[in-house]
């Protein structure tokens, strides 16, 4: 039968077969018409509400990053923790935040919706920043400062002090875990996804989102870190707490203007249904011409785009095979979703399953970023950080700003130079595909670690063979190598982020079903969480394996006695293998394609005939 375009109204001469069989109940066409009518009632204010959303995003990122960016130094300088202990805490904390995004996404999409989730999250972030501020401002909440002499007593924190600190970090886990998966999707909710201006607005919002993110990191890693390191920890932590309070005010000021999409129920239940039914029906023969003969149904007000059939993971197709035992409701809906699923449900599950191998490779990629956000700080502490002849010393944590600068600058170069150039070559509107963008980022990440290894080898050689610049507190001799040599590795990591991070976020957003976009945001951060825990595991394993070896501990407290360069080369090797794996998975992957413009008449007709045959 010839496929015909979807119409908003049915006529007497061209009636939906399901309407004839089921007595004129709600059909797919009626559902679309009702959906369009309901959509007109929604007032999309688009850019008019962006001052509230982007303003909240900016101050929220300034607050969180201002609190966390120098936390590594804070734990060693104020809480008197050893470097490896502090690095392990930071990795575990970052991983917990990232895994927390998955829980928040589930609660958001299932029960509360994005607005309510964000409301709780921004308040939790403020409380977390305030508690961390108190650990610095109240002397009883942190241990006494260590003496400057090498043999001076240096007491660690008490159990109560650690507990209070962890309470503040716990609030930040709740806050950041709720904000990260929901903020981007909530901003995109304010644009009409069906209009051309709305689609352009969503694309532009992605750029603004990452611009504010990098802007906040740059400002936090320069101004806020400088105040914390050179003026006062109390004042330096007051700034992000105040900014988080402003973020709360700005967010709630736009309360009556936002488009607030209600939670649509657990999408995880639909995934479980497809898997369970496919297992139950595993003995059935695969359907012939499955794009025609698999059962399909679109409920009223269905938000997701209608997906074309794909022939990957065909064992899942059996969940949508209609048998004589399967019962349908009068409107065509399965009577028991745990016995019969729709082809649409199956294709949505396929979308998620296809993403997982790509997500795994992207998670390994983040090993680069987690290491480039921690150990370069320790490298800078034992390098020459003087700027010019005026005696100004750049705070060690500030050097990470070059990662953000590299990312920010290259985003502009990518958008204004590379995309137009590649568009002429490939004919694609985006210049290159999303997977090509992610793969390029993984390549640059590997290169940044190789460069980091050579730079650390040079820094260590200078420290061991040339006059040094004194002793770093609780570390070792300060190498005469300028800390500016850290810029190449950090800039390459920034370029990697411009390719891979933005590419991943857009990839997940577009490849996940529409009712799982909070999950799409969370899976991006869960990947970062996996890499954080993997980074902690690698640090602990390398430390334990090498501390008693003849070559010495690679990750010694004094970097001059360690071999951080070999650690960098080891991770570069892991990423090289991961890059090869990603290339294989990219060739296998199939992008999600919608079939919204195709009528369901032919499919419905085949389904009815199939059921009648089964009943007979």
UniProtKB/Swiss-Prot annotation:
Subcellular location(s) per record: Cell membrane
Pfam families on file: PTR2 (PF00854)
Membrane topology annotation: Multi-pass membrane protein
Keywords: Cell membrane, Membrane, Transmembrane, Transmembrane helix, Transport
Family affiliation: Belongs to the major facilitator superfamily. Proton-dependent oligopeptide transporter (POT/PTR) (TC 2.A.17) family.
A GO CC term attached to the entry: plasmodesma
GO molecular function, one term: glucosinolate:proton symporter activity
Task performed by this protein: High-affinity, proton-dependent glucosinolate-specific transporter. Involved in apoplasmic phloem-loading of glucosinolates and in bidirectional long-distance transport of aliphatic but not indole glucosinolates. May be involved in removal of glucosinolates from the xylem in roots.
Tissue: Expressed in roots. Detected in shoots, stems and flowers. Expressed in veins and in the root vasculature with highest expression in lateral branching points.
Protein name as it appears in the record: Protein NRT1/ PTR FAMILY 2.11
Main location: membrane
Gene3D superfamilies: MFS general substrate transporter like domains
């Amino acid at each position: 039968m010839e496929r015909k375009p979807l119409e908003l109204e049915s006529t007497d001469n061209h009636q939906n077969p399901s309407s004839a069989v089921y007595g004129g109940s709600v059909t797919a066409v009626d559902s679309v018409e009702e959906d369009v009518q309901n959509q007109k009632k929604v007032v999309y204010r688009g850019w008019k509400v962006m001052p509230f959303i982007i303003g909240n995003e900016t101050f929220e990122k300034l607050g969180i990053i201002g609190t966390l960016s120098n936390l590594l130094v804070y734990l060693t300088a104020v809480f008197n923790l050893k470097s490896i202990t502090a690095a392990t805490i930071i990795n575990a904390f970052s991983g917990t935040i990232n895994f927390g995004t998955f829980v928040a996404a589930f609660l958001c999409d299932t029960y509360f919706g994005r607005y309510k989730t964000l409301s709780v999250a921004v308040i939790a972030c403020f409380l977390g920043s305030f508690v961390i501020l108190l650990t610095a401002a109240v002397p009883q909440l942190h241990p006494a400062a260590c003496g400057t002499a090498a043999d001076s007593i240096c007491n660690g924190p008490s159990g109560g002090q650690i507990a209070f600190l962890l309470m503040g970090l716990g609030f930040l886990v709740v806050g950041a875990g709720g904000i990260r998966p929901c903020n981007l999707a909530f901003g995109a909710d304010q644009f009409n996804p069906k209009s051309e201006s709305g689609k352009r607005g969503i694309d532009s919002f992605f750029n603004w989102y990452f611009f504010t993110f990098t802007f906040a990191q740059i400002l936090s890693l320069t101004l806020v870190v400088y105040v914390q390191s050179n003026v006062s920890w109390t004042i330096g932590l007051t700034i992000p707490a105040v900014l988080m309070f402003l973020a709360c005010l700005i967010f709630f000021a736009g309360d009556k203007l936002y488009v607030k999409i209600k939670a649509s129920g657990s999408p995880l239940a639909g995934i479980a249904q497809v898997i369970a039914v496919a297992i139950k029906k595993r003995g059935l023969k695969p359907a012939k011409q499955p794009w025609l003969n698999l059962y399909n149904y679109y409920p009223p007000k269905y938000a997701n785009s209608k997906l074309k059939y794909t022939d990957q993971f065909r064992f899942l197709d059996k969940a949508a095979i209609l048998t004589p035992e399967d019962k349908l409701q009068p409107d065509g809906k399965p009577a028991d979703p745990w016995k019969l699923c729709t082809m649409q449900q199956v294709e949505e599950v396929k979308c998620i399953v296809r993403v997982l191998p790509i997500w795994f490779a992207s998670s390994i990629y983040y090993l680069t970023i987690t290491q480039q956000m921690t150990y370069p700080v320790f490298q800078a502490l034992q390098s020459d950080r003087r700027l010019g002849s005026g005696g100004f010393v750049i705070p060690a944590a500030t050097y990470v700003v070059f990662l953000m600068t590299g990312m920010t600058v290259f985003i502009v170069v990518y958008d204004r130079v590379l995309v137009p150039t590649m568009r002429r070559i490939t004919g694609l509107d985006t210049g290159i595909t999303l997977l090509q963008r992610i793969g390029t980022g993984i390549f640059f990440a590997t290169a940044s670690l190789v460069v980091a290894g050579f730079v650390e080898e040079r820094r260590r050689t200078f420290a061991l063979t040339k006059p040094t610049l004194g002793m770093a507190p609780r570390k070792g001799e300060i190498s005469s190598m300028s800390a500016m040599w850290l810029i190449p590795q950090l800039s390459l990591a920034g370029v990697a982020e411009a390719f891979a991070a933005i590419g991943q976020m857009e990839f997940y957003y577009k490849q996940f079903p529409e009712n799982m976009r909070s999950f799409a945001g969370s899976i991006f951060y869960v990947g970062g969480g996996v890499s954080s825990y993997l980074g902690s595991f690698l640090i602990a394993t390398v430390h334990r394996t090498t501390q008693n070896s003849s070559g010495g501990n690679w990750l010694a407290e004094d970097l001059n006695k360690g071999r951080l360069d070999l650690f960098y080369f080891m991770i570069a090797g892991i990423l090289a293998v991961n890059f090869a794996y990603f290339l294989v998975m990219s060739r296998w992957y199939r992008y999600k394609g919608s079939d919204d413009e195709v009528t369901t008449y032919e499919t419905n007709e085949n389904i009815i005939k199939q059921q009648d045959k089964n009943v007979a």
